């Protein structure tokens, strides 16, 4: 399908500003190992000029995780251009907001590559964020301060317990609960009555 990136809110990546005009892009999405990467590569190479490829896969962002992630082969990547691959090491936290920021930072290169970009991947949250942008819940300084105070005085386990007590079902959704920054944000959202974002 062909879609255009919409105007995004002030808290999200604004592709229309980055490209000066709304960006048309093709989206090829599906589950891992369904063959979409190979199809996207062929389509990109048949385009004139060759179309840039933007990965929307939450596992392909990790350097060194090449087995089981269906990353394009080295020869295909050399024929590229590819974006959104090998952005961080596996031990680094990485959110959908970080993904949008990375793609935004790459926009000059994507534009310079020419052709209509092809977004390929199977992470629905990444695809949704590219199409609709992100509008994260508002900050709640009082709740954040309370979380930071618990962390400073009693440590991460106490903060985890406090956040879990606010909403056990929602807290169970938290990705990387050993990351203090994420637990602080979870406490802030749950104390304000917000659900946690769906994990990528």
Cite the ranges covered by each PLM segment.
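Phosphate/pyrophosphate-binding catalytic cores of soluble transferases and nucleic-acid-acting enzymes
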Residues: 2-8, 12-200
């Amino acid at each position: 399908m062909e879609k255009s990136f919409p105007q995004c809110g002030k808290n999200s990546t604004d592709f229309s500003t980055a490209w000066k005009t709304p960006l048309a892009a093709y989206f090829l999405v599906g589950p891992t190992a369904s063959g979409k990467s190979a199809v996207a590569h062929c389509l990109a190479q048949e385009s004139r000029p060759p179309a840039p490829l933007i990965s929307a896969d939450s596992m392909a962002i990790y350097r060194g995780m090449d087995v089981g992630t269906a990353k394009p082969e080295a020869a295909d990547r050399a024929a590229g251009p590819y974006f959104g691959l090998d952005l961080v090491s596996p031990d680094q936290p990485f959110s959908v907001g970080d993904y949008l920021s990375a793609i935004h930072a790459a926009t000059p290169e994507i534009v310079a590559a020419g052709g209509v970009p092809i977004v390929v991947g199977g992470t629905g949250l990444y695809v949704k964020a590219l199409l609709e942008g992100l509008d994260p819940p508002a900050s709640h300084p009082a709740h954040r301060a309370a979380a930071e105070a618990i962390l400073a005085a009693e440590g991460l386990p106490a903060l985890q317990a406090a956040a879990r007590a606010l909403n056990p079902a929602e807290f169970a959704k938290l990705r990387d609960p050993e990351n203090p920054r994420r637990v602080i944000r979870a406490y802030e959202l749950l104390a304000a009555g917000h659900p946690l974002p769906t994990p990528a």
